[in-house]
Amino acid sequence: MLYLLFAPLADDFQLANLFRYITFRTGGALMTAMLIAFVFGKPMIGWLRRKQGKGQPIRAEGIERHVVEKAGTPTMGGFLILLGVMVGTLLWADLTNAYVWIVIFVTAGFGVIGFIDDYLKVTKQTTAGFGGRFKLVGEFAIALIAVVWATHTARSLGVEPGIETSIAVPFFKDLMINIGPLFFVFGCVVIVGSGNAVNMTDGLDGLAIVPVMIAAATFGVIAYVVGRVDFAEYLQVHYTAGAGEILIFCGALIGAGIGFLWWNAPPAMVFMGDTGSLSLGGALGTIAVAIKHELVLAIVGGLFVLELVSVMVQVASFKLFGKRVFRMAPIHHHFEKKGWAEPTIVIRFWIIAVILALIGLATLKLR
């Protein structure tokens, strides 16, 4: 909004010229979202605590100490993140940019699904929540709209025919595999998979939000690079007109994440719930699809992939062979069962997220 107000005045007022710079507006979005999370965090947590009573239900068959230590902690803290992200983005981004709206659409849509899931868990005091099939149908419907919207946007901006339905292979120069209509299925799987992978990761205080911020920072940089002709040509990556504005959304996400972490740091005063984890994961997946770096998401978000795969392996192994591969899934609970302290798991997973992010950034140069 501020961009549309001040950018046209740049020729007459030197200060207004700052609003033409994506980096300046990203900083503004980050600070705005962070302040919102700081200021509204305490009253929102108090309101959630009063409304929810017993808070988020804790799995009785899970980690024993969680039943005692985490019982009564309110959930739906994702509202705080979404508030900061939305206000920060809408205030500082170019609202004529389609990619901004695509990411906002998925973030909000997945947030609604997550809210329904959280609401059912809290009101019924069960860990079951929203039915898995209904949940997936809703997620795939939202993801399909986003993928179609993104490919249409790419075509309207004049990308080379076929690029909009192609997959870029990291570490290989100009290697784009056009999979045609299958891209719509692939894109949906990326977005839905990302949303649920982050959701699986959100099981310990601070575990999910920091890797999400790290991934957002990484993809913000990549979006900025592919959104500039000069950088894209120098690094020999495909150019995506308008993608640079996604950096502003990423900045808002990081700012809101920092503010949320203030309240989610151990011992957590609030959990983000599915309201936050599904929406943030969906946002990361959508960004990856929009800037044609879907496979890089598997690297940068490798921690999320590991968490999701651990659950899939656990379920498949038990159904097929009647045996569990892990002591408990997702895998962070496996390490808890082995006796690792919660802060040890969280910090080590953060370190892994940083390493994977650096590898993901290296794909820009190593080709």
Swiss-Prot record:
The chain crosses the membrane at residues 28-48, 75-95, 96-116, 134-154, 175-195, 206-226, 243-263, 271-291, 295-315, 344-364. One of its GO terms (biological process) is cell wall organization. One of its GO terms (cellular component) is plasma membrane. It is found in: Cell inner membrane. It comes from the Bacteria. It is a multi-pass membrane protein. Its main location: membrane. Coiled coil: none annotated. Disulfide bonds: none annotated. Its EC number is 2.7.8.13. Its cofactor is Mg(2+). Keywords: Cell cycle, Cell division, Cell inner membrane, Cell membrane, Cell shape, Cell wall biogenesis/degradation, Magnesium, Membrane, Metal-binding, Peptidoglycan synthesis, Transferase, Transmembrane, Transmembrane helix. It is an enzyme of class 2 (transferase). One of its GO terms (molecular function) is metal ion binding. It catalyses: UDP-N-acetyl-alpha-D-muramoyl-L-alanyl-gamma-D-glutamyl-meso-2,6-diaminopimeloyl-D-alanyl-D-alanine + di-trans,octa-cis-undecaprenyl phosphate = di-trans,octa-cis-undecaprenyl diphospho-N-acetyl-alpha-D-muramoyl-L-alanyl-D-glutamyl-meso-2,6-diaminopimeloyl-D-alanyl-D-alanine + UMP. InterPro entries: Glycosyl_transferase_4, PNAcMuramoyl-5peptid_Trfase, PNAcMuramoyl-5peptid_Trfase_CS. Pathway: Cell wall biogenesis; peptidoglycan biosynthesis. PANTHER family: PHOSPHO-N-ACETYLMURAMOYL-PENTAPEPTIDE-TRANSFERASE, PHOSPHO-N-ACETYLMURAMOYL-PENTAPEPTIDE-TRANSFERASE HOMOLOG. Catalyzes the initial step of the lipid cycle reactions in the biosynthesis of the cell wall peptidoglycan: transfers peptidoglycan precursor phospho-MurNAc-pentapeptide from UDP-MurNAc-pentapeptide onto the lipid carrier undecaprenyl phosphate, yielding undecaprenyl-pyrophosphoryl-MurNAc-pentapeptide, known as lipid I. HAMAP family: MraY. Belongs to the glycosyltransferase 4 family. MraY subfamily. This is Phospho-N-acetylmuramoyl-pentapeptide-transferase. It comes from Maricaulis maris (strain MCS10). The gene is mraY.
